[in-house]
């Protein structure tokens, strides 16, 4: 099986290291450094996990790639932008911010970096740290439905991975077909937005979902088998927790707001640190 369809890896983080999750970086290395500083990151021992989309749209793509490909304390799942480069989807990649590679690199270098990305950036990442288990996948964990009616299945993390691993071996199917929903999903976050708009959330971002028909509302289940599962891909106005699904893409490349998250060992709650263009102290939140 080609490495571009590398499905899953497990990362075991030493207890003495702190663990941080970061949203879509999109080539903004300086912003990443600022966000990690806010969170109290220690470069000598701590570990950083990204939810994908390391590249495109920003101007420091090579610096970001150097961190996550060649520094063992940095690891990332692949996002849809990373996948463009890995599989050589040139039309979509160039249209969505990939021209930096054409301007800065020759063809052989692009190929070599893409091969390293394919090997080191899985679709799913399981992270074990201080007795907790976390999942990371870029777009989301999409809905699947029971055979009868429109009732949604409750996803189980390890089962999802096993299903995709098995499906990629089907000689009659395109091996990338089964991973695309996990890189691109937005259906779940739309249902979450609809739920929040119906329950008093007044932020304009969520009000765009207010027109959804309530009778078609789908209850978003938690993902079983992990304490939390972290996503990016869909921009949110602030770090968002729903059930045990965490959305961290706060639009850093567009608005200067990049988010880093850390799970508190004692309370089990998530603290987030978001950079701010105006206030160098950023914004700290505890997700409820």
Predicted regions and their residues:
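N-terminal active-site segment of His-dependent metallophosphoesterases
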Residues: 1-66
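Beta-strand-turn-beta hairpins that frame and shape the catalytic cleft
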Residues: 13-20, 126-135, 242-244
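A general structural motif
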Residues: 16, 43-46, 71, 131-132, ...
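Active-site neighborhood of phospho(di)ester-bond hydrolases with catalytic His/Asp-centered motifs
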Residues: 22-23, 48-52, 76-80, 137, ...
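Active-site environment of divalent metal-dependent phosphoester hydrolases
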Residues: 26-30, 56-59, 81-86, 142-144, ...
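Active-site neighborhood of divalent metal-dependent phosphoester bond hydrolases
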Residues: 61-143, 147-185, 195-198, 202-211, ...
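Short, charged, surface-exposed secondary-structure boundary motifs
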Residues: 85-87, 256-264, 282-286
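Conserved beta-sheet core of the metallophosphoesterase superfamily
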Residues: 209-276
